[in-house]
Swiss-Prot record:
<dbReference type="InterPro" id="IPR036188">
    <property type="entry name" value="FAD/NAD-bd_sf"/>
</dbReference>
<dbReference type="InterPro" id="IPR006076">
    <property type="entry name" value="FAD-dep_OxRdtase"/>
</dbReference>
<keyword id="KW-0560">Oxidoreductase</keyword>
<protein>
    <recommendedName>
        <fullName>D-amino acid dehydrogenase</fullName>
        <ecNumber>1.4.99.-</ecNumber>
    </recommendedName>
</protein>
<dbReference type="GO" id="GO:0005886">
    <property type="term" value="C:plasma membrane"/>
</dbReference>
<dbReference type="GO" id="GO:0055130">
    <property type="term" value="P:D-alanine catabolic process"/>
</dbReference>
<dbReference type="GO" id="GO:0008718">
    <property type="term" value="F:D-amino-acid dehydrogenase activity"/>
</dbReference>
<comment type="similarity">
    <text>Belongs to the DadA oxidoreductase family.</text>
</comment>
<dbReference type="GO" id="GO:0005737">
    <property type="term" value="C:cytoplasm"/>
</dbReference>
<dbReference type="InterPro" id="IPR023080">
    <property type="entry name" value="DadA"/>
</dbReference>
<keyword id="KW-0285">Flavoprotein</keyword>
<dbReference type="Pfam" id="PF01266">
    <property type="entry name" value="DAO"/>
</dbReference>
<feature type="binding site">
    <location>
        <begin position="3"/>
        <end position="17"/>
    </location>
    <ligand>
        <name>FAD</name>
    </ligand>
</feature>
<comment type="function">
    <text>Oxidative deamination of D-amino acids.</text>
</comment>
<keyword id="KW-0274">FAD</keyword>
<comment type="pathway">
    <text>Amino-acid degradation; D-alanine degradation; NH(3) and pyruvate from D-alanine: step 1/1.</text>
</comment>
Length: 426
């Protein structure tokens, strides 16, 4: 079967890999001049299945007003009358119940755990290199209230069989010695020993090279203009160079999936959430992080990537704006400086931003679309790197009409056959 994949971020390239390994002929269309040059370029670098949590949680309605007024707020909503933003915010608030939070988190963790298993298998098969470390992830709490709120997450982790360690202040420092000078800043932490770190850009570009060895045809610098449809099915993809045809089509366009599909009546619920990162060179090994640390207060991840530190996170609802705001840089520097002060060259760090494709439930859209021969693999939010391999593997199964490793009704595209059980249960 010939499959046309739209997009060459980490989701598109992993999708191409698993489709090619399943024996399909694969063509990848990408507007940039190479793989992983947009949202996958400089993300936080963490692969953290256990920390896969919905943004829509019971505490958000209470915390959001305080965040909006805080100097170093983890969330900023730029004033807008955009109907898509207002609809997305209302849908997210509807998911801020304990029942929906726990259900969505369980779906996310299941997919993320499966994805890590797929990544480990891929690494063993190929020997792919991407500054990978398997040293766990530590979520640090600056207040006792944050520590107490971790209880509901630990309950889900227990139910799903995910190992974890609840640590006091000294336990955190034992795992991350660089926190020694910040002992009065933290009260404790939650550590997941099975989590990993790695450079998503290096992984994606290396996997694209491996894909070529499997016969995948990458067509970089190709503008995707739209889908050609007739009789309820997709017949091709319009590009300036003509129509690209196949037997199946997979949309991996991240935050651009929603406007791309809207003319065909397909609503993914995906909205762009801007995140920022700094990439800094390590100047003092003893003060640097060993693996990934999550700063619960500022929603920032601080990750060791070889001889660099990646500081990433925050959330800004501002549509498709990609401007770099100095105030966001200041927040990243404040988080990293207060925990790993003197570890890296923050003033010379590279400042970057990207658009995460977020759904109101934080669960991605994977599987068949309402149009025949069309599939989606999008909406992974902040967890595209964590969920990439598993999402691609189950998507490849769906395209090939094989029984997937996970129940795809949990990630169904609205209006698709797989979404029917969810609609009836709603």
């Amino acid at each position: 079967m010939k499959v046309v994949v739209l997009g060459a971020g980490v989701i598109g390239v992993t999708t191409a890999w698993y489709l090619a390994k399943a024996g399909h002929e694969v063509v990848v269309l990408e507007r940039q001049d190479g793989a992983a040059l947009e949202t996958s370029f400089a993300n936080a670098g963490e692969i953290s299945p256990g920390y896969a949590s919905p943004w829509a949680s019971p505490g958000v309605p209470r915390k959001a007003p305080k965040w909006l007024l805080a100097r170093h707020a983890p969330l900023i909503v730029r004033p807008s009358l955009d109907p898509a933003l207002l609809s997305w915010l209302l849908a997210m608030l509807r998911n801020c119940t304990t029942e929906r939070y726990l259900a969505n988190k369980a779906r996310m963790v299941r997919l993320a755990e499966h994805s890590r298993d797929c990544l480990i298998a891929l690494r063993r098969e190929t020997g792919i290199q991407y500054d990978q470390r398997s040293r766990g992830t530590l979520q640090v709490f600056r207040t006792q209230a944050q520590m107490d709120e971790a209880g509901k997450d630990m309950e889900v982790l227990r139910d799903l069989g995910v190992p974890y360690e609840l640590l006091d202040r000294l336990g955190c420092i034992a795992r991350e010695p660089g926190l020694g000078h910040a002992r009065d800043t933290i009260v404790g932490g939650l550590r997941l020993p099975n989590d990993e770190t790695g450079d998503c850009f290096k992984f994606t570009t290396a996997l694209a090279d491996l894909c070529r060895g499997q016969g995948v045809d990458f067509r970089f610098g190709t503008t995707i203009q739209g889908l050609e449809t007739a009789g309820g099915e997709v017949g091709g993809v319009r590009t300036p160079g003509g129509t690209v045809t196949g037997d199946a089509y997979v949309v991996c366009l991240g935050s651009y999936s929603e406007p791309f599909l809207r003319p065909h009546g397909i609503r993914t619920g995906v909205y762009p959430v801007k995140g920022y990162s700094l990439t800094a060179t390590i100047t003092d090994e003893a003060k640097a992080p060993v693996s990934t640390l999550l700063d619960e207060t500022y929603k920032v991840a601080i990750t060791r990537l070889g001889d660099r530190v990646r500081i990433g996170g925050l959330a800004e609802l501002a549509g498709y704006d990609l401007s770099l705001r100095p105030s966001r840089r200041a927040t990243l520097e404040h988080s990293a400086g207060s925990l790993f002060g003197g570890s890296c060259d923050l003033p010379s760090a590279t400042f970057w931003c990207g658009l995460r494709p977020m759904t109101p439930t934080s669960t991605p859209r994977i599987g068949e679309a309402p149009l025949r021969r069309l599939f989606l693999n999008t909406g992974h939010g902040t967890l595209g790197w964590t969920m990439a391999c598993g999402s691609a593997q189950v998507l490849a199964d769906a395209v090939g009409r094989q029984a997937p490793a996970l129940d795809l009704t949990d990630y169904a595209v609205p209006g698709s056959p797989a979404a029917e059980p969810l609609r009836r249960a709603a």
